[in-house]
UniProtKB/Swiss-Prot annotation:
Leader peptide range in chain numbering: none
Region annotated Disordered, chain positions: 1-48
Gene that produces this protein: rplO
Function: Binds to the 23S rRNA.
Family label: Belongs to the universal ribosomal protein uL15 family.
GO biological process: translation
The name this protein goes by in its record: Large ribosomal subunit protein uL15
PROSITE patterns named in the record: RIBOSOMAL_L15 (PS00475)
Keyword RNA-binding: yes
SUPFAM superfamilies in the cross-refs: Ribosomal proteins L15p and L18e (SSF52080)
Any Pfam family: Ribosomal_L27A
One GO molecular-function entry: rRNA binding
Length: 153
């Protein structure tokens, strides 16, 4: 076998379409139909053009604001969910994972004040709402914030 004897496998190369070369096959109108704007050279409309009707991208309201790529999304745990722990327990993201309150450690944990807590717990999380902090401390518990930035590094 030599380089000059190499050839592509049969059927792997297709002949290109040659339009407008005689009346057989794709001759005459060359697949463009008869007359009209799209039959002319350079006659294609711009993307989004709807024939003069107000296009959909102008009919719909614009999306406003911006998307912050550096935002921190939290896994939310409500304080009523913490009632599954015994009084005096130290509640950390690890114990929450073991109890099934959170699924994984991908996002930091934030404690919110939905519901009521009726026991004193030592709760450690990355973030607390003010109302959640107040309710935990009112029930005789303690609140400790974990530094998420230090955990990442």
């Amino acid at each position: 076998m030599r380089l000059n004897e190499l050839s592509p496998a049969p059927g792997s190369k297709k002949d290109r379409k040659r339009v407008g070369r005689g009346d057989a096959g794709r001759g005459n109108y060359s697949g463009r139909g008869m007359k009209g704007q799209k039959a002319r050279s350079g006659g294609a409309t711009r993307p989004g053009f709807e024939g003069g009707q107000l296009p959909i991208y102008l009919r719909l309201p614009r999306k406003r604001g911006f998307f912050n790529p550096f935002r921190i999304e939290y896994t939310v745990v409500n304080i009523e969910q913490l009632n599954i722990f015994e009084a005096g327990t130290e509640v950390t993201p690890e114990t929450m994972l073991a109890a099934g309150l959170i699924r994984n450690f991908v996002k930091p944990v934030k404690i919110l004040a939905a519901g009521h807590i009726d026991r004193a717990l030592e709760v450690s999380a990355h973030k607390f709402s003010q109302a959640a902090k107040a309710q935990i401390e009112a029930a005789g518990g303690k609140v400790q914030e974990i530094d998420y930035a230090a955990e990442i590094e």
